[in-house]
């Protein structure tokens, strides 16, 4: 479930901006400039939050032609982190992410549709736990501009909800925990 969340969020976040020209960006994951977080209901009483600490990706964006934007993200599934060592070990097992067999999750965009007001729907193929399914990330442009180090940056955020069984995650967590929400924020540095 964590793989889904990361891939979906990172890819969705990268395609919504307001850039005046086409440009390619590398996702800057240092210093929490980008993250792929997830949350899932814990027994229906609260939220269990987690993140993926190791991922890479890039995106291209042209505000004048958002439909030509592209996003690619690869997440290392063993980097799942819920701040609880035993739970993280279980999430890495074949009950959930099966990191020994599927060490990465990937997202590759297939289309971007502007929905107005700096938002877009990013559709793409998410491969998680050895299963590839189309997902839609609701993305929003945050901002862009020069940074203090001579570079140029653009930022996006996005979210999607994944159904665990769609990605062959069969562990029964109860009726309140059949889906996981992915929350993605990315800042890209223009190449």
Curated annotation (Swiss-Prot):
Chief location of this protein within or outside the cell: periplasm
Name listed for the protein in its UniProt record: UPF0312 protein PST_3941
NCBIfam families assigned to the protein according to its UniProt record, in alphabetical order: PRK03757.1
Pfam families: YceI (PF04264)
Entry's Gene Ontology cellular component terms: periplasmic space
N-terminal signal peptide: 1-22
HAMAP family xrefs: UPF0312
Domain of life: Bacteria
Family: Belongs to the UPF0312 family. Type 1 subfamily.
Subcellular location: Periplasm
Organism whose genome encodes this protein: Stutzerimonas stutzeri (strain A1501) (Pseudomonas stutzeri)
This protein's UniProt keywords: Periplasm, Signal
């Amino acid at each position: 479930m964590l793989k889904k969340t990361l891939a979906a969020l990172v890819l969705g976040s990268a395609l919504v901006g307001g850039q005046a020209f086409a440009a390619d960006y590398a996702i800057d994951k240092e210093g929490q400039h980008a993250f792929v977080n997830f949350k899932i209901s814990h027994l229906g009483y609260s939220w269990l939050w987690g993140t993926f600490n190791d991922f890479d990706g890039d995106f291209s964006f042209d505000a004048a032609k958002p439909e030509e934007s592209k996003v690619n993200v690869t997440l290392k599934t063993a980097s799942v982190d819920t701040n609880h060592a035993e739970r993280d070990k279980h999430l890495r097992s074949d009950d959930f992410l099966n990191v020994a067999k599927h060490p990465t999750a990937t997202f590759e965009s297939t289309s971007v549709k502007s929905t107005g007001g700096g938002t877009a729907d990013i559709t793409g193929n998410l491969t998680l736990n050895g299963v590839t399914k189309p997902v839609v990330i609701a993305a929003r442009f945050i901002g862009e501009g020069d940074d203090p180090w001579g570079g140029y940056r653009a930022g996006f955020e996005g979210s999607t909800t994944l159904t665990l069984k769609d990605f062959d995650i069969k562990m029964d967590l109860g009726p309140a925990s059949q889906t996981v929400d992915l929350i993605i924020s990315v800042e890209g540095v223009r190449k």
